[in-house]
């Protein structure tokens, strides 16, 4: 995914890549095969959907992996502090995010703010994904594609109405 801002043109961009690896517990050193130069600069952030703090105004008990239990899969709640090393099945979602904001004097602050925002966004999204398991588990590929098409249609409609403001997946 590549995001740009029309006003800032080439002075602002966010690029992110994602790779899901079944059976991985986060041990792959370079899952997305980035260059040695980028490896030296990267900052690895581990997201723990059960134990990472989220802003209190975003907290919903029904989206808390420490409280959620899937009726369909039997997964959850994630109450063991070491759940990441014990649960089965397991998958790691490796994400690589490049943030570039070229504006003298505030570049570092804006990039740092955006990195924290992206971390919060990914944490909230993956908490929701886990806690909504019973809504999507067992869907066929055709049902998923239909849901994607409906979501795209709804987003396009909102985009045509004006600015999209979303704090979580339910807002979209």
Regions found by a protein language model. Give the residues of each.
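Eukaryotic helix-grip
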Residues: 1-172
């Amino acid at each position: 995914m590549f995001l740009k801002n029309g006003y800032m043109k080439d002075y602002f961009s966010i690029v992110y890549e994602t790779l899901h690896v079944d059976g991985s517990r986060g041990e792959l050193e370079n899952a997305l095969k980035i260059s040695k130069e980028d490896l030296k600069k990267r900052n690895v952030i581990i997201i723990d959907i059960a134990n990472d703090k989220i802003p209190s105004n975003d907290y919903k008990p029904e989206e808390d992996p420490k409280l959620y239990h899937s009726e369909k899969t039997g997964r959850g709640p994630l109450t063991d502090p070491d759940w990441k090393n014990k649960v089965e099945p397991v998958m790691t979602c490796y994400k690589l995010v490049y943030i570039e904001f070229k504006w003298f004097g505030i570049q570092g602050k804006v990039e740092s703010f955006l990195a924290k925002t992206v971390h919060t966004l990914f944490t909230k999204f993956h908490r929701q994904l886990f806690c909504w398991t019973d809504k999507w588990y067992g869907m066929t590929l055709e049902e998923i594609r239909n849901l994607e098409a409906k979501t795209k249609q709804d987003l396009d409609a909102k985009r045509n109405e004006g600015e999209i403001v979303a704090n979580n997946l339910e807002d979209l």
